[in-house]
């Protein structure tokens, strides 16, 4: 797949980062670069709304303030503290990550994608989030919100329908990350998809991407498609 033209990439990066400077959300896990805290937030946010995660994130870190504290805890207690976020395999996996990290890496979460993804419950997205949000690496992320934004901006409706899987989206996400700005750029992508380029009633009329968005031409009455 040929990538977007460099001028389009630059426009997208500038528009998104400018939007984020004005509209980015103030979330508690964005006030830290501690890998453990970033990990907790990312695992909690899987399939769970931000508003539900915020109080539980704070409560969980009061109970288990470090990877060492979590690894030393009984898994039943970890699951109890997790309730009622749901998807109860997540606290079990988080506990397993803590124990394996203590046993194999001296309590320091790895800082390379391959080793991170070998840990239980860490996939490509979570590894990218840890690398960009905790370690300052130029790593891409791809979740539901990011996929929707990229699909609308860069793919015409017909070509989007022909896509299968996420391979091309990951490739595009990697092309788009601006050198040295992955932290802000990735946070901006998630916020933009969650609050602006939403599944229903996206704000196409006020969108900073409207001058070059492939979907903007077909966005009518708040319906931008997938």
Model-derived segments and spans:
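Catalytic cores of DNA base-excision repair glycosylases
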Residues: 3-10, 14-15, 19-222
């Amino acid at each position: 797949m040929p990538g977007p033209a460099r001028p389009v990439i630059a426009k997208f990066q500038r528009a998104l980062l400018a939007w984020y400077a004005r509209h980015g959300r103030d979330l508690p896990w964005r006030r830290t670069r501690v890998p453990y805290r970033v990990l907790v937030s990312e695992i909690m946010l899987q399939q769970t709304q931000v508003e539900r995660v915020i109080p539980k994130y704070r409560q969980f870190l009061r109970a288990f303030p470090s990877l060492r504290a979590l690894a030393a805890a009984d898994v039943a207690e970890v699951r109890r503290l997790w309730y009622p976020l749901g998807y109860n395999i997540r606290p079990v996996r988080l506990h397993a990550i803590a124990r394996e990290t203590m046993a194999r890496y001296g309590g320091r979460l790895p800082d390379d994608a391959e080793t991170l993804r070998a840990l239980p419950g860490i996939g490509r997205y979570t590894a990218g989030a840890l690398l960009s949000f905790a370690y300052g690496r130029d790593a891409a992320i791809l979740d539901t919100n990011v996929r929707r934004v990229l699909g609308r901006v860069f793919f015409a409706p017909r070509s989007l329908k022909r896509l299968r899987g996420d391979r091309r989206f990951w490739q595009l996400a990697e092309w788009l990350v601006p050198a040295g700005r992955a932290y802000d750029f990735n946070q901006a992508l998630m916020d933009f998809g969650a609050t602006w380029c939403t599944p229903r009633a996206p704000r196409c009329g006020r969108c900073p991407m409207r001058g070059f968005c492939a979907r903007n031409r077909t966005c009518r009455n708040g319906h931008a498609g997938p």
